[in-house]
């Protein structure tokens, strides 16, 4: 079980990313566009740098939806490998079967 503060911090980061996502995409498009003037590109870079660090999507950590475990995360299920295995053995994941060959 992850610390509650770590889970809460990650949720806060998700909210900040959502709030700034549209403007960040606009600024990145301006920076990447080869037809943009140097002055506009520089202004866009300064604005992007002045945004909070947590506005970057790479700072959000994928965590297990049940206990917040940060490692061994399986995107398809939204669970860690440990929790997924436990739930699969109990038959709580529809369509998941133990493999046999």
Curated annotation (Swiss-Prot):
Record has Isomerase as a keyword: no
Keywords of this entry: Ribonucleoprotein, Ribosomal protein, RNA-binding, rRNA-binding
Single GO term (MF): rRNA binding
Biased composition (Basic and acidic residues): 61-70
One Pfam family, short name: Ribosomal_S14
Signal sequence bounds: none
Cystine pairings recorded for this chain: none
Chain segments carrying region Disordered: 53-72
InterPro entries given in the database record: Ribosomal_uS14, Ribosomal_uS14_bac/plastid
Biological process according to GO: translation
Organism superkingdom: Bacteria
GO (cellular component) term, any one: small ribosomal subunit
Subunit structure: Part of the 30S ribosomal subunit. Contacts proteins S3 and S10.
NCBIfam families hit by this protein: PRK08881.1
Physiological role: Binds 16S rRNA, required for the assembly of 30S particles and may also be responsible for determining the conformation of the 16S rRNA at the A site.
Similarity comment: family membership: Belongs to the universal ribosomal protein uS14 family.
Official protein name in the record: Small ribosomal subunit protein uS14
Species annotation: Corynebacterium glutamicum (strain R)
């Amino acid at each position: 079980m992850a610390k509650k503060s770590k889970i809460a911090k990650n949720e806060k980061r998700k909210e900040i990313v959502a709030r700034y996502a549209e403007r960040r995409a606009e600024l990145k498009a301006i920076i990447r566009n080869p037809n943009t003037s140097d002055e506009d590109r520089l202004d866009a870079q300064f604005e992007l740098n002045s945004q909070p660090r947590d506005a970057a999507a790479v700072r959000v950590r994928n965590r297990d939806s049940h206990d917040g475990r940060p490692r061994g995360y399986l995107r398809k299920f939204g669970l860690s490998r440990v929790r997924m295995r436990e739930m699969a053995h109990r038959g709580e994941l529809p369509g998941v079967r133990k493999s046999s060959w």
